């Protein structure tokens, strides 16, 4: 049975710039916002945009990510006419090969895409924080009779050299793509979100690989090839909150912005919920000694200290005399007595002993998943 649009989430990134936080976890599986993982935003956008069939292409350290996604039930992707499929590298008669780029990952999964038989494919990155209506983007794609639509957003011109930049005509037709140009001509940055007519993209990928001219990356290879061939390539302008959380600084910044309930993410918006897979935990327990200001505290937490402008995920134990400020603490962490944590990210299941100071001064301080720092005489 044919479907109108298939979602493909590229979730195999190693995320080396996140250091300790991606040592054993794929970047899209890194926790965010107290109860989410980064990939929840792309999956929730699909669910809210009526994209009911989604393939998640994984590669690096997929176990946590696979367990989190499961059968897709938290996002409503487990119905008769919907589904989420985990797509990992595999062996065939031609041998086995790791994905060598974004478009190569799609090429390696042509058989899955053909089984879904979509008219359009929606290509997404699994490591961005944003809320977006993909149906509106598809309508723009169809109205313009585009072969490829690239979602873009305006960035300050002085920062444009950090992005892939789309140069357009007066009708937003893309006439040139520049990857991180030293002297950008435009401030329209690619968001790594694409809608392709599947029949044409399939043809381009197959022709390239069959003729020994591999097309490995959407930004570096596919978009320039489409423009050079005179295809209808258009920019779709997105206005809203969007953050690439691929560095420690950007992850920390976005986490702190998440504490502002008036930000453009608006997690309280019932019309566009962000869904996630969460284990059932006991209610949080707040002692009479707790001092809290502008913070998110998850289920299962025991807090007996001071929490200021911070996020505490689920099942965190904070003992007496401890102060946490401007920090993101991931789930399962134990923090002892008289600890000071400021401008930091603490990974899942870490153990912080008594009287320890973790203070990010010139840069954000990071404690990895399961890392132990100091000793605690009363660990529970």
From Swiss-Prot:
Pathway: Glycan biosynthesis; glycogen biosynthesis. GO terms for molecular function: ATP binding; glucose-1-phosphate adenylyltransferase activity. It catalyses: alpha-D-glucose 1-phosphate + ATP + H(+) = ADP-alpha-D-glucose + diphosphate. Keywords: ATP-binding, Carbohydrate metabolism, Glycogen biosynthesis, Glycogen metabolism, Nucleotide-binding, Nucleotidyltransferase, Transferase. Pfam families: Hexapep_GlmU, NTP_transferase. It is an enzyme of class 2 (transferase). PROSITE patterns: ADP_GLC_PYROPHOSPH_1, ADP_GLC_PYROPHOSPH_2, ADP_GLC_PYROPHOSPH_3. Belongs to the bacterial/plant glucose-1-phosphate adenylyltransferase family. Involved in the biosynthesis of ADP-glucose, a building block required for the elongation reactions to produce glycogen. Catalyzes the reaction between ATP and alpha-D-glucose 1-phosphate (G1P) to produce pyrophosphate and ADP-Glc. HAMAP family: GlgC. This is Glucose-1-phosphate adenylyltransferase. It comes from Lactococcus lactis subsp. cremoris (strain SK11).
């Amino acid at each position: 049975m044919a479907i109108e649009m298939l979602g493909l989430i590229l979730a195999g990134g190693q995320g080396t710039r996140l250091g300790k936080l991606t040592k054993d976890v794929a970047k899209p599986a890194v926790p965010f916002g107290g109860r989410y993982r980064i990939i929840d935003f792309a999956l929730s956008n699909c669910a809210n945009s009526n994209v009911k069939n989604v393939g998640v292409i994984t590669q690096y350290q997929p176990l946590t990510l696979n367990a989190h996604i499961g059968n897709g039930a938290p996002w409503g992707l487990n119905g008769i006419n919907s589904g989420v499929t985990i797509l990992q590298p595999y062996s065939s008669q031609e041998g086995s090969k790791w994905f060598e780029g974004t478009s190569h990952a799609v090429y390696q999964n042509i058989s899955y895409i053909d089984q879904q038989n979509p008219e359009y494919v929606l290509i997404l990155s699994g490591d961005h924080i944003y809320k977006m209506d993909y149906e509106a983007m598809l309508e723009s794609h169809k109205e313009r009779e585009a072969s490829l639509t690239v979602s873009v957003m305006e960035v300050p011109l002085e920062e444009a050299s950090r992005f892939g930049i789309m140069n357009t005509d007066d009708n937003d037709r893309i006439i040139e793509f520049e990857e991180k140009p030293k002297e950008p001509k435009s401030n329209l940055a690619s968001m790594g979100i694409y809608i392709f007519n599947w029949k044409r993209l399939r043809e381009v990928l197959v022709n390239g690989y069959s003729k020994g001219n591999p097309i490995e990356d959407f930004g570096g290879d596919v978009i320039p090839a489409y423009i050079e061939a005179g295809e209808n390539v258009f920019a779709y302008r997105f206005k809203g909150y969007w953050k690439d959380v691929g560095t420690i600084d950007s992850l920390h910044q976005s986490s702190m912005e998440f504490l502002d309930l008036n930000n453009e993410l608006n997690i309280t918006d019932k019309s566009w919920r962000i869904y996630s897979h969460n284990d059932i935990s006991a209610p949080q327990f707040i002692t009479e000694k707790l001092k809290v200001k502008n913070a998110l505290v998850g289920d299962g937490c025991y807090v007996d200290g001071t929490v200021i402008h911070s996020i505490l995920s689920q099942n965190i134990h904070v003992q007496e005399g401890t102060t946490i400020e401007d920090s993101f603490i991931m789930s399962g962490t134990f923090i002892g007595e008289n600890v000071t944590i400021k401008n930091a990210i603490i990974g899942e299941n870490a153990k912080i002993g008594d009287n320890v100071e973790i203070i990010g001064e010139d840069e954000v301080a990071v404690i990895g998943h399961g890392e132990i720092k100091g000793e605690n005489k009363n660990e529970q």
